[in-house]
Amino acid sequence: MTLRPLTLAVMAVLCAAPLDDVVARSAEAAPASSTPAEITIEPARFAPPPISAMPEEPASRLRPLITRYRADREALEHVRSLVDDGREPLYAPSRAQLRAGLVANWQARLAELDTNTLNQDDRLDRLLLQRELALDATAQTFGKERYEALRGLLPGYDDLVALLEARRDLRQADPRRTADVLERVRRDLEARASRLTAASGAPEVSPTLALRAAQHASALRRGLEDWHTYQSGYDPQFSWWVDAPYAALDKQLEAHGKLLRDTLGGAADPETLRADPIGDAAIAEALAAEGVDYSPAELMAAAEKELAWCQAEMDKAAREMGARDWREALERVKQHHVAPGEQPRLVVELADEAVHFLEARDLLTVPDGAKRDWRMTMLTPEYQLQAPFFLGGQDVWVAFPTDGMPHERKLNALRGNNRHFSRAVVHHELIPGHHLQHWYAQRHSTHRSSFDSPFWTEGWALYWELRLYDMGFAATPEDRVGMLFWRSHRAARILFSLGVQSGRMTPDEAVALLVDRVGHEPENAKAEVRRSIAGDYGPLYQVAYLVGGWQFRALHEERVTRGGWSEREFHDRVMREGSMPIRFLRERLFERVGGEAPGESWRFLDNPANASAR
């Protein structure tokens, strides 16, 4: 039996009832809370500790080099960016040459260092900077390969990019010659569109490639708009020669992008989910760069075992609730949501509850200033189409229905953000999760901020979901179901992310996986997949949650369970070391950072702490 028929049946019942009745029933069903007193805001919370109590930051010979490289790179990107909206996929030859030169020069500078004269922190920073340079070089190669694959769909691509790059070189456009270029590209695009739409002569164009080319066409339009505004009206000759050809080209580019996106890409409906898989080779390279010595097949097998473990645990909780199985238990839990307008109050309650739990067990240091130096923002209805739950970092963003949402969307949002689901993830977004990471990153090892890894960022927050579950943070069977729902979700993310990025699973199949095997609302599942493939996150970002959590669990077992460190010592040390791939962090915690990247394989899934994945 799948969850989809059950979900649709329940939704039909709920949608037939007034929303007030649904809220009233859920409020009656929700277990009472026994949260400790709310944390208060006092001026002393933001006072620094005495100098003698501040942990000493290790001096690093590499810190000035890292700072200089970061400044050089940011300057290059600032000057050579062709589209100033943060979403530019364009391949620009001159910029690529400058990037390659920057990487090569810095690699040469690092080679001048004698690793025998470096201490552990210096060696670590050197390896992290080396890794970042190598990743930059790999990204440049990958970008060029993708450009070569699509340039045939966008005739004149190189000519238009040359105009944009000339502006970055501070060269004024020659009006007459520029007009000729724009008109020639317009005619070539028109001819290419005719061939693409001709029934007899249409070449084989994959939807994936067509959609990628459509993104480039859109980026060219945005770049050219800024380029045109820069000179039009300020240079009479430019306006006289260029304005009309530019307007005609812009119209042609818009039509060409629509052809690529809607007709060849099959994405005329904005609700259509389309992915752009990176392929097996790129997946393997990305995992290797993170120090993950497992193949995609091995990770997917571990995710299947974790998912089965979660469902068995859910069945136990379901029996305690008097439910037939985990699906019925999950359906009951989804009814335990607060009334409209009450979610912000619940978030504060749950945030404080997590802090009290951590401090009562001396698990890590939660600085007073970190407990309330975050804001809360409600996600807009539009943003909830991609992020139907919580988001976090420096602050927390909360998903909950608004009065203007359609009735069914209101119910989806209420059910998906119920008390028990929320209790399982508020600490993920705030403390000890992302907000605490941000607090420490602003004050310790700040030069390592550019070495961020999603396996560290999301793995740390996910690790705490696993640890808190083991320590009994879920006080009721309903709370356990809430935590197990999200743990199942993380396992499913490995399955669908690796499946979609390899091209072996479609986005629609990913949605079905989340609905049928995890228990998501259909609309929430679609939003989760849309967010994963929209391009705002790296292709392995969703994989990083549970895999990073497994890595941290294994590292905890090595250093605390077997190594004799205290809980606080381990967790505080992780936070103070700063962001990096966990494989590198492991070397630092064992005081064995060498001159080269770690060579010994780390089979963290074999660690007894990860028995649920074996």
Regions from the PLM with identified roles:
Residues 20-23:
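Sec/Tat signal peptide C-region and signal peptidase I cleavage site
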Residues 2-3, 25:
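N-terminal acidic, proline/glycine-rich, low-complexity intrinsically disordered segments
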